[in-house]
């Protein structure tokens, strides 16, 4: 009986400490990366503005090639919606909110695992010279308490790095 009592006190103590730590961690997150690609701004932007192409280069598609994807609307235009379901990388939805071809920018809202809270994401292509472009891919969002504790263990930046490296390989072939 004493063992059970000490065991329960220990478990409750660990849970309490974990929740206390989470209370002091940031509830916002920022992730992203950038890369230079040896292609013109126009070529790169025409490829990245199409959300259906993301499955060719994003790292999450490589983690789970069996992702179930659904698309609604006209790809590369505001309102286009991509939803996915995956046992390995989770479920979510991505909606194009703005496309600015002149500035090489596409803005998107990301919703993870049924959340109603939009995480803001964008891809931006900038011309370095007529044959080299810089691509930025970033996301900013919120993680509710106590799930913000996961921020200590997950680094999405490496997934953005890998995705942009895959994009570079595809476009520079």
Name each model feature, range by range.
Residues 2, 6-68:
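Hydrophobic ligand-binding cavity/cleft-lining segments
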Residues 3, 107, 172:
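Hydrophobic small-molecule pocket/channel-lining residues, especially in calycin-type beta-barrels
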Residues 37, 41, 47, 89, ...:
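Solvent-exposed, acidic/flexible segments
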Residues 38-42, 97-104, 124-134, 169-173:
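A short, structured loop/turn motif at beta-sheet edges
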Residues 49-56, 101, 165-172:
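Sec-exported extracytoplasmic/periplasmic mature domains
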Residues 52-93:
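Short beta-edge strand/loop motif at the mouth of beta-sheet-based domains
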Residues 78-128:
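Structured, soluble extracytoplasmic/luminal domains of envelope-associated proteins
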Residues 109-162, 167-169:
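Beta-strand/loop substructures that line and gate deep hydrophobic ligand-binding cavities in soluble
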């Amino acid at each position: 009986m004493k063992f059970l009592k000490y065991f329960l006190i220990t478990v409750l103590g660990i849970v309490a400490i974990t929740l206390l730590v989470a209370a002091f961690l940031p509830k916002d997150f920022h992730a992203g990366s950038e890369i230079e690609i040896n292609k013109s701004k126009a070529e790169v932007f025409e490829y990245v503005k199409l959300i259906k192409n993301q499955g060719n280069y994003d790292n999450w598609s490589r983690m789970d090639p069996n992702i179930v994807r659904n698309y609604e609307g006209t790809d590369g235009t505001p309102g286009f919606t991509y939803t996915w379901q995956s046992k390995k990388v989770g479920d979510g939805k991505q909606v194009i909110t703005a496309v600015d071809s002149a500035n090489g920018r596409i803005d998107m809202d990301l919703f993870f695992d049924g959340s109603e809270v939009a995480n803001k994401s964008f891809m931006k292509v900038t011309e370095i010279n007529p044959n080299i472009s810089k691509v930025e891919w970033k996301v900013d969002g919120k993680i509710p308490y106590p799930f913000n504790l996961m921020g200590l263990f997950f680094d999405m930046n490496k997934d953005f790095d890998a995705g942009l490296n895959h994009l570079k390989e595809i476009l520079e072939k």
